[in-house]
């Protein structure tokens, strides 16, 4: 039983979302459709956006690989160019975000990653300082820290649902 697993299929834990196989059940944390929504929301709040950088940790690049196809489709349909902005250390954030600010029409998508969550206050303050509109993946953390806009699954609700699954499993019931 997993409450929130980033990519159960890509991680080899489940055969598919509809039919995971084996003795596993739970809730996936990644939904590729979110990538397209991040692009469209950012374009809606910053209509002059023509360039988006995807801020990601190359050590755990699976979120970038997971979301990139849908982000590229959405960006292309809105006339937006996409680039990757890898951040390996805390010091990399300033150069990545200030680099986006060097020309007009820039925006930033902060990709799902624990490294980005841990450094959210720095990321949010740099985006504000350099006036780069940014959208963040984890609503509870980034919204409470002052992020411009967030859009993600409701992780708290997923944990509540997982608790219900665990209760049923421990009582001998099925999760379907």
Task: Indicate where each model-derived feature is located.
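Short hydrophobic alpha-helices and adjacent helix-cap/hinge residues
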Residues: 1-176
């Amino acid at each position: 039983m997993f409450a929130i697993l980033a990519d159960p299929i890509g991680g080899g834990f489940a055969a598919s979302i509809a039919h995971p196989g084996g003795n596993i059940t739970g809730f996936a944390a990644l939904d590729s459709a979110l990538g397209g929504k991040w692009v469209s929301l950012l374009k809606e709040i910053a209509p002059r956006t023509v360039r988006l950088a995807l801020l990601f940790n190359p050590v755990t690049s699976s979120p970038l690989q997971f979301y990139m196809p849908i982000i590229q489709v959405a960006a292309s349909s809105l006339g937006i160019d996409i680039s990757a902005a890898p951040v390996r250390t805390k010091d990399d954030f300033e150069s990545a975000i200030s680099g986006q600010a060097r020309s007009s029409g820039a925006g930033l998508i902060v990709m799902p990653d624990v490294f980005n969550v841990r450094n959210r206050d720095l990321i949010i303050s740099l985006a504000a300082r350099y006036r780069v509109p940014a959208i963040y993946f984890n609503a509870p953390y980034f919204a409470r820290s002052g992020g411009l806009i967030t859009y993600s699954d409701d992780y708290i609700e997923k944990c509540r649902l997982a608790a219900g699954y665990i209760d049923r499993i421990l009582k001998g019931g099925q999760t379907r």
